Design a protein with these regions (language model features):
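Conserved phosphate/anionic-ligand binding catalytic regions in large, soluble enzymes, centered on
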Residues: 50-65, 197-211
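Conserved small/polar residues in nucleotide/adenosyl-binding loops
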Residues: 257-261
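Internal alpha/beta scaffold segment
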Residues: 60-94
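Hydrophobic alpha-helical scaffolding
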Residues: 59, 63, 106-114, 213, ...
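Generic, well-ordered alpha-helical scaffold segments in large soluble proteins
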Residues: 68, 72, 76, 119-127, ...
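A structural-propensity feature for long, helix-poor, extended segments
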Residues: 1, 88-104, 227-253
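Accessory "access/gating" subregions that flank catalytic or transport cores
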Residues: 5-46, 98-191
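Catalytic phosphate/nucleotide-handling subdomain of diverse soluble enzymes
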Residues: 201-203, 207-228
Length: 262
């Protein structure tokens, strides 16, 4: 409840205009991981230091916000007779009816996502301390990355809106996280400020198989073998997240490095 208090006023303002955002388990979801490829992971780096890494976002309420404005954008494309190569490329132009509301809603969802991750990180550290039964403290910089969001930035001499979908900000010196699959290593990186990528880099390895294809093509035995040496779930319900469903993370990192992104 305490974590929700700073979010409440903004949420109430959103719901005054968009009642659909209510009843989205917004309070109950705060401090929860979610499904899909969301995870909490304990990692050892090359110095045998422990990193606690988690991947989660704005949960059900963020999904409702995104879905609602996507519907509005598609309707506006039809209303303005704008023909797109794909209907999923619908957009909300700056200065249009819903633009300011969209920016406000996405900004609030980013705040929710940040609060969600902070709450889970604190709970995870407390759980580790409870198990180890010895005091410890985290003495390194915490790294936080939004990876599905919009940001008002200055590029090529202009103020622009940057949409990062499955991408993180990689300004010069900025720290970022690029997770691998559940059977691969993850990387903590520093951005190089590449303007050609609008100071962005990959958020992860990226899929080479859809969830349904992975479930169809990968056996449980193959999944168990691929995650050998990793303490994680090894049952049929997580085969859609099996390592072979993703690109090799080393290849992704190599490409980012050679392209001066991170």
């Amino acid at each position: 409840v305490d974590a929700w208090k700073p979010l409440n006023d903004g949420f109430e303002r959103l719901c005054e205009k968009y009642p659909r955002f209510k009843n989205t388990n917004n309070i109950n979801h705060l401090g929860t991981l979610g499904t899909g490829n969301h995870f909490i992971e304990l990692c050892l780096d090359e110095n045998n230091d422990v990193w606690v890494m988690l991947h989660s976002g704005s949960r059900g309420v963020g999904n409702r916000i995104g879905s609602h404005f996507i519907e509005l954008a598609k309707k506006d494309m039809e209303r303005w007779f704008i023909n797109l190569p794909d209907k999923d490329m619908a957009y909300i132009p700056e200065g249009s009816d819903y633009f300011n509301d969209y920016v406000q809603a996405v900004g609030w969802a980013q705040d929710f996502a940040m609060a969600n991750r902070v709450l889970m990180m604190n709970n995870t550290l407390q759980a580790i301390q409870d198990v180890l039964k010895i005091p410890f403290q985290a003495n390194v910089e915490a790294v936080n990355c939004h990876h599905n969001y919009i940001s008002h930035e200055h590029h090529y001499g202009k103020d622009v809106w940057v949409t990062r979908k499955g991408a993180v900000s990689a300004k010069k010196g900025e720290m970022g996280i690029i997770p691998g699959s559940m059977g691969a290593k993850s990387f903590i990186v520093r951005g190089l400020g590449n303007e050609e990528s609008f100071c962005s880099c990959s958020h992860g390895a990226g899929r080479i198989m859809s969830r349904s294809e992975a479930k169809r093509r990968v056996s449980l035995d193959e999944h168990i073998k691929a995650t050998q040496g990793v303490e994680c779930r090894k049952d049929e319900s997580v085969i859609d997240e099996t390592p072979s469903a993703y690109k090799p993370i080393e290849a992704v990192i190599c490409l980012l490095y050679t392209s001066d992104a991170a």
